[in-house]
Amino acid sequence: MILDYNKLKQETKAIVVDIIERSALKKGQIFVLGLSSSEVSGGLIGKNSSSEIGEIIVEVILKELHSRGIYLAVQGCEHVNRALVVEAELAERQQLEVVNVVPNLHAGGSGQVAAFKLMTSPVEVEEIVAHAGIDIGDTSIGMHIKRVQVPLIPISRELGGAHVTALASRPKLIGGARAGYTSDPIRKF
């Protein structure tokens, strides 16, 4: 599959802006990215990693999140136990467990390599509880999204050759029929 990188940038931006807006993210919250550049390029996950594709996607997403004051956490593959690259400032502020690994294309993946290159002071953390996220290429980001997870159907379900899904989160509804609830900015009730 031959990708048009300008189109990839435009489509990435459209998808991520859609998910940011519909997930009702606020300044200071965390957004997870799961990315298989192999899937984006039309291959199988983990088999055809592309640093170029990873950098394009992470750069676009970082720009959109940064302009809104939202933090990015980039999930790695199972070879790094799905650890995440975040800014050191976030890890310190949230008292996250920092782990020692430097990602490469086949241990961490192209998204993590790009995050290490593009972030100000990147570190790997063992786990995180994020408010929303996007999964490009069926990498399974659910373990990093807080409860209650709300699936969002992206404006486009594909990016290149990759399947795209997204999750937001909302507070638990407790109390049953007698309870009243505040409005839900995600589902609009």
UniProtKB/Swiss-Prot annotation:
InterPro entries in alphabetical order: Antibiotic_NAT-like, DUF436
Superkingdom: Bacteria
Pfam families linked to this entry: DUF436 (PF04260)
HAMAP family for this protein: UPF0340
Family: Belongs to the UPF0340 family.
Protein name: UPF0340 protein SAG0103
